[in-house]
Amino acid sequence: MTRYIFVTGGVVSSLGKGIASASLAAILEARGLKVTILKLDPYINVDPGTMSPFQHGEVFVTEDGAETDLDLGHYERFIRTKMTQGNNFTTGRVYEHVLRKERRGDYLGGTVQVIPHITDEIKRRVYEGGDGFDVALVEIGGTVGDIESLPFLEATRQIRSEKGANQAIFMHLTLVPYIKTAGETKTKPTQHSVKELRSIGIQPDILICRSEVELEESERRKIALFTNVEERAVVPLQDADTIYRIPLMLHEHGLDDIICDKLRIEADEVDLAEWVRVLDAKLNPLKSVNIAMVGKYMELLDAYKSLNEALIHAGIQGRVKVNIDYIDSEDIEHHGTERLAGKDAILVPGGFGERGVEGKIATARYARENGVPYLGICLGMQVAVIEYARHVAGWADANSTEFTHDTQHPVVGLITEWVNAEGKIELRDAASDLGGTMRLGGQVCHLKPGTRAHEAYGLDEITERHRHRFEVNNQFVEALESAGLVISGKSADHSLVEMIELPEHPWYVACQFHPEFTSTPRDGHPLFSGFVNAALAYKAARARAQQS
């Protein structure tokens, strides 16, 4: 029998519902429970796949190819359960499904309404997502009071009514602001936020109170009194120096015991040893490296959320502090590569569109010519191939058809056919819709023995997640290999280039997939660990050269 914990947010957005949900899930998992997390997004888009990174941040890709909210990345980094298509759905997807049923005549000519048809579809998806788990946390996007969230809140209210208080509870995350000029915290916003929830029939069972400073017992009592929440269930959550401390903080405040009591769960004693190790390694590094990340969405670093975390994870595995210098590729394009000087390694991440691409190409060239460790991901691999084709193979006009068709050497082109993870052939062309038409999800890659890629993974075959519609053009592969480029990874049917590297370079590796999506703080990822180790080696070699 699945228990449900519905997580809502109030006062302001971006309070960290995703981190709080993931942290609670990590504690419950550490008590021997099988846990999953769902994210319900109120926007009308079917999924975030076509949304601007500046608006939405990163699009996280699941193993089964879903383009989802970045919070699902947090979920996978905190718990062992892998997310799927069913772990994230939007208002747009719900309405799309209901309208499709209406067109088929499934409602027998009835009037289709928000209640019961939309709410019933939301409930169906929640029940389906939680099936087979001991506990399902359900995070509702947005802030209480938003008109877009109302159908989701109504559906969860109905689930609570159907399941009862011992099988479904509400956890509300609020902000308790600290007014520095007055030297005190204010509980009134929390009171009003709970009042808003209660006005639609939801009484929260637990309050997580975010605050810049530690909450006094008197303030917790006051919040409990005015919100009708049990005092011990008013859980303070002070700002932390790292998100990987949050599971330990919530456990210290007894949140998991409160949950188990309210849901009548008999669970094992908690074992958070892995999180203690992660936190110790994060806070007590023995070495440091400086890595330049050259991208095109630097105004919103959430666009690279999983990538940032993957570098931190690699640092945790080796007790290395990874300092990231975020550089806009347009700055490189317009002002040159001076900002790359002195860096221990360079990373070029994915992206879409022509803007800033020449800056990325210049970055790849700088790393190649100066022997600086380089990791290219998705577009980062494509620009490495373009750069190599232009300056080593001698094709000055080499480019990608994503950016121009005016080239004799389109070394990167649109994928028109590939074999998906289920062994089926998928076809695309330039007229295909943008949404949901990329090569998505986990794909098998065969690694070439004796390469740095094979050395990093220690495997002949790997599975990594993809999100792209352009790929290295096979017409030019043989000529590129003759010019010295090594194809170190190929797709399951050996038809697509998945990884490239330069054998004479200290560490120059690029991949078409997104390894950051499978990195976790407890396990890291072999490719990022190899990259950080290469940065350490380069830094040490440079120091020796300066001393001699």
UniProtKB/Swiss-Prot annotation:
Residue numbers binding UTP: S13, K186, T187, K188, P189, T190, Q191, K222
Binding locations of CTP: S13, D146, I147, E148, K186, T187, K188, P189, T190, Q191, K222
GO BP term (any one): 'de novo' CTP biosynthetic process
Residues annotated as catalytic: C378 (nucleophile), H514, E516
Example GO molecular function: ATP binding
Catalyses which reaction(s): UTP + L-glutamine + ATP + H2O = CTP + L-glutamate + ADP + phosphate + 2 H(+); L-glutamine + H2O = L-glutamate + NH4(+); UTP + NH4(+) + ATP = CTP + ADP + phosphate + 2 H(+)
Role this protein plays: Catalyzes the ATP-dependent amination of UTP to CTP with either L-glutamine or ammonia as the source of nitrogen. Regulates intracellular CTP levels through interactions with the four ribonucleotide triphosphates.
Record-listed Mg(2+) binding positions: D71, E139
Domain of life: Bacteria
Keywords associated with the record: ATP-binding, Glutamine amidotransferase, Ligase, Magnesium, Metal-binding, Nucleotide-binding, Pyrimidine biosynthesis
HAMAP family: PyrG
Region feature Amidoligase domain, mapped onto this chain: 1-265
Something else known: CTPSs have evolved a hybrid strategy for distinguishing between UTP and CTP. The overlapping regions of the product feedback inhibitory and substrate sites recognize a common feature in both compounds, the triphosphate moiety. To differentiate isosteric substrate and product pyrimidine rings, an additional pocket far from the expected kinase/ligase catalytic site, specifically recognizes the cytosine and ribose portions of the product inhibitor.
Pathways involved: Pyrimidine metabolism; CTP biosynthesis via de novo pathway; CTP from UDP: step 2/2
Protein name as it appears in the record: CTP synthase
Family according to the record: Belongs to the CTP synthase family.
Species this protein is from: Chromohalobacter salexigens (strain ATCC BAA-138 / DSM 3043 / CIP 106854 / NCIMB 13768 / 1H11)
Regulation (activators, inhibitors): Allosterically activated by GTP, when glutamine is the substrate; GTP has no effect on the reaction when ammonia is the substrate. The allosteric effector GTP functions by stabilizing the protein conformation that binds the tetrahedral intermediate(s) formed during glutamine hydrolysis. Inhibited by the product CTP, via allosteric rather than competitive inhibition.
